[in-house]
Amino acid sequence: MLSAFQRLFRVLFVIETVSEYGVLIFIYGWPFLQTLAMLLIGTVSFHLWIRRNRERNSRSGKTRCRSKRSEQSMDMGTSALSKKPWWTLPQNFHAPMVFHMEEDQEELIFGHGDTYLRCIEVHSHTLIQLESWFTATGQTRVTVVGPHRARQWLLHMFCCVGSQDSYHHARGLEMLERVRSQPLTNDDLVTSISVPPYTGDLSLAPRISGTVCLSVPQPSPYQVIGCSGFHLSSLYP
């Protein structure tokens, strides 16, 4: 299992036992991949802790109804996009979506001090890394990993929010409010993907730019909705 984790995240794990019930884990590698590995380890540990407590409560005679409600609540949070938690599927980490965003656009979407970053991640079933002042002109580099449809939904939302067209801008703000307030459903993702692409809107070019890679089985990587202002290419040459 450890070697599989190291191959998946391209990091090195060094594990030392510090007590009878705990271990100390050192993770070496690219900072973003270190973060992903830590989040996955923490999430899996939390779910194992929940499962262990649920089994303990069941053995002690607690009502099955309460346990079933807790299980359904957890499943809704982890299985909205697939039968397995998305962070356990390697393909969701193979091709991060990377682009640059203006500072004021970052604040509009993620809030002052990135207040809404965590809730957007949780509700969209993705992980998002923001690197402020990544370019000489002060742009923020945004890296997104997660299921393809979730990344495509976020990309569509970013495009709409950054558009100078009043209709698309309003649509983007509606999508932004939704992902801030509640988890996305499969219906949300299907609706976003089915929206006809708006071509010819070059107003996004000075607002959002960079590399966008959405690797899914499709005839051409350029068939990404609402991206006329993006430069699309492979993240890893």
UniProtKB/Swiss-Prot annotation:
Location in the cell: Membrane
UniProt xrefs under CDD domains: FILIA_N_like
GO cellular component: cytoplasm; membrane
Keyword Membrane: yes
Record keywords: Membrane, RNA-binding, Transmembrane, Transmembrane helix
Presence of keyword Transmembrane: yes
A GO molecular-function annotation: RNA binding
Membrane topology: Multi-pass membrane protein
Principal localisation: membrane
Transmembrane spans: 7-29, 33-50
Positions of the KH domain: 96-155
Annotated disulfide bonds: none
Family according to the record: Belongs to the KHDC1 family.
Protein name, entry field: KH homology domain-containing protein 1
